[in-house]
Amino acid sequence: MELPRLENVDLSGKRVFLRVDFNVPVENGKVTDKTRIEKTLPTIELLIKKGARIIIASHLGRPKGQVNPEFSLAPVVETFQSLVKSKVYFSKTVIGEDAIKLSKELKNGEILVIENVRFHKEEEENDPGFSKKLSALADIYVNDAFGAAHRAHSSTEGIARLLPAYAGLLMHKEILELSALLHKPARPFVAIIGGSKVSTKIKVLTNLFDKVNHLLIGGGMAYTFLKSRAIPIGNSLVEKEFEVQAFQLIEKAGVAGIDLQLPVDHIIGDQFNEKAKTKSVDKMGILDGWMGMDIGSKTVSNYEKIIKNAGTIFWNGPMGVFEMDKFASGTMAIAKAVAKSKAKTVVGGGDSIAAINKAGVADKITHISTGGGASLEFMEGRKLPGVEALKKKTSE
């Protein structure tokens, strides 16, 4: 996939509108995970080196088109400032005369971060007038926000049609790594798909079907698959409306020669909290009044053997309720197995990344995708509006 590149563009003295994904967790006014900020630093450093005057835009959370101090980028700017050597300014407005004035006062290599673009409802509406007001801040547009590329918003899609537009280094890397998974994976290709709901993963499972050799299922979504096979699941999470599709996927895997694996044992709890009583049960099923909270040791062992021999691994979604320590062992074991593998490894989704960090093995993963919903949609084979807007620039 060809996207317009920054490397050979003269940016000296030019105002560059850089859309990033600084949608990071903030607690008590402090950023608790800097991963997404750190991932876009190579693009920012390249722009500084080229003498650009950088205007950074991002969203944070869901303020529903209204100014809400809880979702201000101010604490994010504080963290960002500590990671770059350049002078960083913060605009409390997104558009208008004050923001334009600040953008024009920037010197080469300096940075202006504007306030949360979602403080304006027009942002998510991809309003042409709002896109035009954003474009008034800059001469050139760069999109490095792969995590927001699946949204057709003003700052990800609308503005790209009004200014010379380029992809940032992170955007390029994400597209390159995920495209390689879909088109030329080293074999065997193992996909590990977890998380709580089948409904959010059914499309990616379907798209991966003709590409993977092994499909390892875990997390709450596994219980819809097990229920579809009439295996007792007690009070475990189940999406009844997806039972038929889950059963059809199991059947389809058998016909296609894909090794689709489901948990054969479970760590169960009698309630959904840290105070829950726990026990281990095998494939005979889960008792009424109990719910599956993690994969068991036999399942871990089965999955580890497949992971060990993989050529390529894609992991999205935890194996259990890993936020609770007593139900974290399955996810932690899979994280360590993936890290130990000699395969090319790609991990996507907030919970999987949190698990990799919790296990202390992030540095052993080939590529950690910042995408979340965007990487899932890409793996579903869908077109991402933020990427398509850049592609159109290359064909114009």
UniProtKB/Swiss-Prot annotation:
Catalysis: reaction(s): (2R)-3-phosphoglycerate + ATP = (2R)-3-phospho-glyceroyl phosphate + ADP
CDD domains: Phosphoglycerate_kinase
Protein's cellular compartments: Cytoplasm
Domain of life, per lineage: Bacteria
Subunit structure: Monomer.
Sites where the protein binds ATP: 201, 292, 323, 349-352
Full protein name: Phosphoglycerate kinase
Family: Belongs to the phosphoglycerate kinase family.
PROSITE patterns, A to Z: PGLYCERATE_KINASE
EC class: transferase
Recorded GO CC terms: cytosol
UniProt: substrate binding residues: 21-23, 36, 59-62, 118, 151
InterPro entries in alphabetical order: Phosphoglycerate_kinase, Phosphoglycerate_kinase_CS, Phosphoglycerate_kinase_N, Phosphoglycerate_kinase_sf
